[in-house]
Amino acid sequence: RVVLSSLERNADGGQWIHWQRCFGSQTTIAPRYGTQATSGYTPNTNVDPGGINEPIIFEPTDQLGAVNSPLGGGLQVWAAISGVNTTLWGGCNVYGSYDGVTYSHLGRVVGPARMGVTTTELPVFSDNPAGPNVDNVNSLGVNLSVSAGALLSGTAEDALALNTACYVGGEIVAYRDALLTGASTYTLSYLVRGAYGTEDSMEAAPKPAGTPFARLDQGIFKMPFDKTRIGATVSLKFQSFN
């Protein structure tokens, strides 16, 4: 019985292989390096995901609800939701009640909305009846650190098509450029203002720094309701999961 004892490489690229004959009970040679059994990765699904940040809850305009919702329009309530623990929070189950006692499951949110607050004032802007309200004068600073959110720039066509639509304290604003200025902080420019029928909010008053901000995408929870619920109070509960 023989075993491999060493392997040498020559300068010309050749190799010397040394074998050792084993006699009697000597059948193995101890390895130079030992091995360690692998344990693999076992996720702990019972880790507390923590609570949520204060959600941004609003009623979309008819135009916004009809275009950006799989519900096909109608009366709706939208909510931007994110977790306090941006590492462990995976989403939440949403429950609603009209009497504050009996709750029913309304849906499930997976992943956080890209939400936060503005860091600069957004001035009023005059409506342009002839076309889109393109604001090349003002920019908007936003901080999304509560949700660890990230924004990407688009094109002028994206902004005009409202592909980058955001909720800014009642006004819907789309943007072309998102300049990263710090961790989860951006300056948005080439703004399309007062979209989806929110011209009144655009012209009413300046929106100060600290105004709620949310990127309108698939991360927004949408709850329909019928006209018999107009004026009623709805209570919402958010059950987080990791």
Which ranges hold each PLM region?
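Interface-prone segments of viral and bacterial extracellular assemblies
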Residues: 1-242
